[in-house]
Amino acid sequence: MAQEQLFADEYKVNLDVFEGPLDLLLYLIRREELDIYDIPIERITTEYMKFIEDARRLNLDIAGEFIVMAATLMVIKSRML
């Protein structure tokens, strides 16, 4: 869960009227500094879902790299026995 929050913190919204983190967008809308009608929610949702999918793929790549590294360390250690 904490790792998912890290990915969510990295997501940036890019719109004509706003560019920045999602939580800042929500803050500005709540303070009525941005008009909710200028925000294409469907576009943000679609882009966020793509971002999450890319993050999951990256996470698997990192996990795969770790497994290879750990296996290599085990081979080296077993040769030293």
PLM segments and residue spans:
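Long, charge-dense, low-complexity tracts
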Residues: 1-81
